[in-house]
Amino acid sequence: MNKKTIVVKFGTSTLTQGSPKLNSPHMMEIVRQIAQLHNDGFRIVIVTSGAIAAGRHYLNHPQLPPTIASKQLLAAVGQSQLIQAWEKLFAIYDIHIGQLLLTRADIEDRERFLNARDTLYALLDNHIIPVINENDAVATAEIKVGDNDNLSALVAILVQAEQLYLLTDQQGLFDSDPRKNPEAKLIPVVEQITDHIRSIAGGSGTNLGTGGMMTKIIAADVATRSGIETIIAPGNRPNVIADLAYEQNIGTKFIAHQSDRLESRKQWLFAAPSAGIITIDNGAQNAILEQNKSLLPAGIINVEGRFSRGEVVKIRTQSGKDIALGMPRYNSDALQLIKGRKSADIENVLGYEYGAVAMHRDDMIILS
């Protein structure tokens, strides 16, 4: 039975529990839950904050000027401490992790997008838990995603997750600021993110982190528009991750309509200019249209145009009908070399391989 893919984002406040350093006992409890879900067959991706806090503690809280360079210094030192903390705890359960440091450019550039996604899929397929952070040590304002809430939403889209959990020091989204209004009520379900929902989100909750409730609302909006259910929940609640995975009602759930997942991809692919044409044989046509299969090199008859890996191309039948748009795993030169060949021959012909398929079904939209 295939279990769902879940992206879990941990804010600095969740990992430090209000202290100036990573809280090892609390992280141990987090890892226990994720290990349980991992062993139960769930595909878990971690997006972690905490590098700057870890770096500051490791350097014994140095007096640094409030500059970007100072933050990048702390991130550079702290990232190794952060990943070591995760690694040591998961090793207790004999679970391997893999670190990815991303910037906005890795998400927005199509070829780098595919490379990042392929890496994530390879980790998950080999039962390795990806641990992701923004590459704060080198990212400039122009290439920063901005905060790990937004990064987690983009990662959820990248791996086509079913759910995104944003764990924080709050119980969820309230109808007013609970720190100022003791009568504030938790909003258990948000059907649609409206201006009213945005208006009740406050600022950053702690001085250790960079995100507040507003960044979580923005992230939820990005994720739910792509068909990914998003939940803001308290990171300090016992067993919160496992309970959410097994569908207990905790925190605030943002409903995603599954039609949005396909529609958002359709809009993106339809808007992109076609860079080339791949003509396929009747067997490949049947596999794509009738069996919802990926396109294999063996089914390719001809390749027209010059295009890079990840650019949008048309898939055309022998009769000249365009049946799909999609992003190929290989560029046009590579496809010319492997067309008509078995997938097992790809590495021998090219000297490398990005997988057995020329175009994955997840990167393909069928034209009506």
Curated annotation (Swiss-Prot):
- Pathways per UniProt: Amino-acid biosynthesis; L-proline biosynthesis; L-glutamate 5-semialdehyde from L-glutamate: step 1/2
Q: For this UniProt record, give its keywords in alphabetical order, as a comma-separated list.
A: Amino-acid biosynthesis, ATP-binding, Cytoplasm, Kinase, Nucleotide-binding, Proline biosynthesis, Transferase
Supply one GO molecular-function term: ATP binding
Q: What is its main location?
A: cytoplasm
Cellular-component GO terms for this entry: cytosol
Family named by the database record? Belongs to the glutamate 5-kinase family.
Record-annotated residues binding ATP? K9, T168, D169, T210, G211, G212, M213, M214, T215, K216
Principal EC category: transferase
Question: Per its record, how is this protein called by name?
Answer: Glutamate 5-kinase
Intracellular or extracellular location(s):
Cytoplasm
Q: What does the function comment of this entry state? A: Catalyzes the transfer of a phosphate group to glutamate to form L-glutamate 5-phosphate.
> What reaction is this protein's catalytic activity?
L-glutamate + ATP = L-glutamyl 5-phosphate + ADP
Leader peptide range in chain numbering = none
Q: Which residues form a coiled coil?
A: none
Q: Where is the PUA domain?
A: 275-353
**Which processes are annotated in GO (biological process)?**
L-proline biosynthetic process; proline biosynthetic process
Which Enzyme Commission number(s) are listed?
2.7.2.11
Residues that, per the record, bind substrate: S49, D136, N148
